[in-house]
Curated annotation (Swiss-Prot):
The modification Phosphoserine is found at residue 103. Residues 6-84 form the RRM domain. Interacts with TRN1. Binds to small phloem-mobile single-stranded RNAs (ss-sRNA, e.g. small interfering RNA (siRNA) and microRNA (miRNA)) in the phloeme exudate, including viral-derived sRNA (vsiRNA). Residues 86-168 are annotated as: Glycine-rich (GR) required for cell-to-cell movement. Belongs to the GR-RBP family. CDD domains: RRM2_NsCP33_like. This is Glycine-rich RNA-binding protein 8. One of its GO terms (molecular function) is siRNA binding.
Length: 169
């Protein structure tokens, strides 16, 4: 798909928030082409994040500016630019820095910055400051994070998750 998509990643959503709620909330910034909450394949329950696709870039930028860190359905949400699925490492998608699965920057599962499971910075299980078995301040990005035995993961050096030097179990 060569066409540019103006899509936002939205993380930290309440379980009760649905596609229509996203559409309604974000349509104040411009024409919403699509809004989708990602559900767990097995349980069918919301995974706490989704995507909103806008018709134009200005609407997307305005939504990111206005909604990131704001409250929706009683939860503070993370909103940032989602990268196209094909872009790979540099800019986002899986394993990149923008949004979406395993993002480095903003939210989602294994997110480095925003919430999400195994998040390095803010929120989620095994985060740096709080969560299951975390060291409360040192490296630690969940299992084996931060370059094994050097600040995270099993037996980590300073403040990682399980068995980290600065705390943990």
């Amino acid at each position: 798909m060569s066409e540019v998509e103006y899509r936002c990643f939205v993380g930290g959503l309440a379980w009760a928030t649905n596609d229509e709620d996203l559409q309604r909330t974000f349509s104040q910034f411009g024409d919403v082409i699509d809004s989708k909450i990602i559900n767990d394949r097995e349980s069918g329950r919301s995974r706490g994040f989704g995507f909103v696709t806008f018709k134009d870039e200005k609407a997307m930028r305005d939504a990111i500016e206005e909604m990131n860190g704001k409250e929706l359905d009683g939860r503070v949400i993370t909103v940032n630019e989602a990268q196209s699925r094909g872009s790979g490492g540099g800019g986002g998608g899986r394993g990149g820095s923008g949004g979406g699965y395993r993002s480095g920057g903003g939210g989602g599962y294994s997110g480095g910055g925003g919430g999400g499971y195994s998040g390095g910075g803010g929120g989620g299980y095994e985060r740096r400051s709080g969560g299951y078995g975390s060291g409360g301040g040192g490296g630690g990005r969940g299992y084996g994070g931060g370059g094994r035995r050097e600040g995270g993961g099993y037996g980590g050096g300073d403040g990682g998750s399980y068995g980290g030097g600065g705390g943990g179990w």
